[in-house]
Curated annotation (Swiss-Prot):
GO terms for cellular component: large ribosomal subunit. One of its GO terms (biological process) is cytoplasmic translation. The gene is rplB. The keyword rRNA-binding applies. It comes from Ligilactobacillus salivarius (strain UCC118) (Lactobacillus salivarius). The lineage of its organism: Bacteria, Bacillati, Bacillota, Bacilli, Lactobacillales. Residues 210-219, 259-277 have a biased composition (Basic residues). Belongs to the universal ribosomal protein uL2 family. This is Large ribosomal subunit protein uL2. One of its GO terms (molecular function) is transferase activity. Part of the 50S ribosomal subunit. Forms a bridge to the 30S subunit in the 70S ribosome. Keywords: Ribonucleoprotein, Ribosomal protein, RNA-binding, rRNA-binding. Residues 210-277 are annotated as: Disordered.
Length: 277
């Protein structure tokens, strides 16, 4: 994927960049793999805002992605690379030898016409999915399961990858994109290669309207709110925070406060924290 720069014909276009979509080979999605997706605008079942600054945006259909890859030893041909509005990565349309179609995350380097497989004894090549027990140490992987059979949950964003560092008994040791090193059961599956569309992080939105197309609403600073809306609010003019530390809208410290539970059951699987230098 390349980055397309726009001429400064307006102020909004001046610093705007976007994808050139050079990798995309098909513009209309596969109808059988689409489901409707209703908007929540950041509200829960009671209609109360649980996530601020969300609402509006372009209407989308959800693409059913196969994160499990349990159709073993049936070769699938890559028919197209498509855009997915619901994620940063592109997706690949697979057609299996028995005629079944499915979407997967498009790894870096995957081309139309390539054949991919899943199973214990498949080749170590980009797009193939295997249990961690069958993947050589040092291999770059993505779409990693946390529980066997649940489907990939880790390393799914554009340009991300993890590396298999070693194996100890029934656990594999993996270094994630964040730098965290953790143990995962060797019976969990992962896909070979890094996620494609790696230049996604270089895109500059350029104008407020483009953020609105994505369903993101404006964000106000706490210091310009009233005291009943935010701990930083109130005062005459540009008043200071007036507290020992900056606060979240709910009165929690925002600088250095640990949010992870010390009793989290998964702590024992973390070999090295992502926060350690």
């Amino acid at each position: 994927m390349g980055i397309k720069k726009f001429k400064p014909t307006t102020n909004g276009r001046r610093n705007m960049t976007g994808s050139d979509f050079a990798e995309i080979t098909k513009t209309k999605p596969e109808k059988s793999l689409l489901v409707s997706k209703s908007k929540t605008a950041g509200r829960n079942a009671y209609g109360r805002i649980t996530v601020r600054h969300r609402g509006g945006g372009h209407k989308r259909k959800y693409r059913l992605i196969d994160f499990k890859r349990v159709k073993d030893n049936v070769p699938a041909t890559v028919k197209a690379i498509e855009y997915d509005p619901n994620r940063s990565a592109n997706i690949a349309l697979l057609v299996y030898a028995d005629g079944v179609k499915s979407y997967i995350l498009a790894p870096k380097g995957l081309k139309v016409g390539q054949v991919v497989e899943s199973g214990k004894d498949v080749d170590i090549k980009v797009g193939n999915t295997l249990p961690l027990a069958n993947i050589p140490v040092g291999t770059v992987i993505h779409n990693i399961e946390l529980k066997p059979g649940k489907g990939g949950q880790l390393v799914r964003s554009a340009g991300t990858s993890a590396q298999l560092l070693g194996k100890e008994g029934k656990y594999a040791i993996i270094r994630l994109t964040s730098g965290e090193v953790r143990m995962i059961l060797v019976t969990c599956r992962a896909t070979i290669g890094a996620v494609g569309n790696e230049q996604h992080e270089l895109i500059k939105v350029g104008k407020a309207g483009r953020a609105r197309w994505a369903g993101k609403r404006p964000q106000s600073r706490g210091s310009v709110m009233n005291p009943n809306d935010h701990p930083h609010g109130g005062g005459e003019g540009k008043a200071p925070v007036g507290r020992p530390s900056p606060m979240s809208p709910w009165g929690k410290k925002t600088t250095g406060l640990k949010t992870r539970s010390k009793k989290a059951r998964s702590n024992k699987f973390i070999v090295r924290s992502r926060n350690k230098k």
